[in-house]
């Protein structure tokens, strides 16, 4: 039974039992920014199990793509050394949300395995939690499982919990017995870690709610969460003891064998490569790109581990990305998103492979030298850190090599080196830092800026030079804290508001507003009179600047959505800056964006602006926001209540910034630049509204000037330029022909200037007006004509000297063109080289050329 047939059989079986088939969620969990990767089928149903989300069905089934690499669940170091560890696997699951419970879950599992798949009952072993008498009775008394193939286990293996508190409950696991010829004992026995009994299905019964004191309270509606590894089940059904021998892996292993030249399909490095292409490809599909932090670094580690295993097999050229088409053939039907993103996956992996290839060989030499000089069995932390810092070797890659040599790595020493580097970085970043905007204040400010541009407020505190004062007078710079404010404080990439605090003839100009804890710091200067603590003032923001910031912030959301639409869902925000004058957006992408793509992105943003969709801003609890589809950034800390900014069907994000009410208020949107700022990170800068109109006016003015210079009308500029380009190419062609004729005639004249030196015809001369191509053509003619010959020809263009040297092949044993041209080039401030019969060089001192050419005869005399 193929893996594809198993997927279908599983889903079909549970759909017949009233379950709704739910497509796999991404390997990047959209509902849990604290979780590195989706590592189980239940992750996409987490809110449903917690009662924070309701679905239109109470029974679900899925085939979930999962990753276990990095974080709590990390199988990376075992991949390639065991039969069943993978960084990527597929989990078959069926779920009950307060519907059926233990009896039905056990019946479904047993029926599917023994009847649908036809597995012999005597090959299956059952475990239950030692205190779960209910599950025990169902298995032994109702299902008729033999007590000889049944065991009770402790909480370590058979009690599941979502965390220290919350839903939890006992598990029942189903194992497959691979036979007495395989080492290992049954679950619960001293030798249970062998390969004879392999867990294939885990049935989790969410039965209790664990409180902080450890008390277990029965849930009013218990649920079921089950998970079965497709790869393990396929190994059973295909009569294999090693997952890498199933159909899903064999096609990839064979392709890796073809690319590396390794013929042994059981080679552990081939298996590592086959496993790693699966996890790497699906990470890119779901928006992860190689980087030096978070998920991106996990991806980088896995890619580089795969490349190192290819290098171990003798493959020094890039190869890893070439496995993607084979993977698509195997898994594209089950995961259409893989087909859609194939080109992006190939490009991202190829770029990372090319980047690492530049340092891999040198890094391996350093490591080999260190290993050769080891007096013990531990690679030092300093060596591991040097490989990491200089050559891009993740620690686990170095540990992988060490493991193959029965060595280990001083990980504690490596961490000491890392911490020392972090300390240096902190010191550098804090150098000269000022804390002038840090004040001793623990109160709070009520923000009313979403609704109001101005409001009366009371001055709660004033700080001058970080010292709390009762009063500030004209000319003094100060920080003012109010009890409430319409001023937006700098956060989320949006700059703080500017404006004024006034009362009668007293005025304080606010240059910026920042947040410290729950307090808003109004930073500025007293411009008239004085201000005092307890004084009631009118706080008024610069409305024009605020509206411009709102336009740019809303445009940033539309830009983010447009980038994901045009470039792919791997695009994720890496940073942003929203000012009244412009916006800047940093995002993950693996290559420069083409002019055509930039135009498409700009048009898509403007299209959504012109739709004039209402911008809905709503506060809701975090789980409701996630359920609505709002994007949550990995690593961001969100409170229980978040603000959701919804722009029609095009964009929905969590955001605390200020925005327009309708997208049409943004006005025109223009991209002004696109650039790369780091590996895998691009930056777009853009303007909106009046600033965008200004760029259009400037371009229009420039076009008018160009048209005037070309003596044509605006509509004809493009065709006129094309005409001029064509004419220029024709003129260049004619010039080249004339230069060739001139050089040829000069060459004919030069033939009479040949001097014979030790039987060799020597010629060294300058050709006026010649380029390098003309020098070569002339050289070829003269070399054939003057056989045996040693010739140097030169040309001068400004302060640059071009040199070519040619030597007849019959004399290259003694007279070599590369050495000859280098002899001349060194005298004119340059260098060069090439083949024994043909070489080229350059120089930057034309004043020495005549003398250098004169030295050729003497040089030939010494070698010929």
Curated annotation (Swiss-Prot):
Residues annotated for Zn(2+) binding in this entry: 553, 557, 655, 659
**How, per the record, is the cofactor bound?**
Binds 1 zinc ion per subunit.
Keyword set includes tRNA processing:
no
From what superkingdom does this record's organism come? Bacteria
InterPro entries annotated for this entry?
aa-tRNA-synth_II/BPL/LPL, Ala-tRNA-lgiase_IIc, Ala-tRNA-ligase_IIc_anticod-bd, Ala-tRNA-synth_IIc_core, Ala-tRNA-synth_IIc_N, Ala-tRNA_ligase, Ala_tRNA_ligase_euk/bac, DHHA1_dom
Q: Which HAMAP family match?
A: Ala_tRNA_synth_B
Please state which protein family the record places this protein in.
Belongs to the class-II aminoacyl-tRNA synthetase family.
Protein known as:
Alanine--tRNA ligase
The scientific name of the source species is Hydrogenovibrio crunogenus (strain DSM 25203 / XCL-2) (Thiomicrospira crunogena)
Please state the gene responsible for encoding this protein. alaS
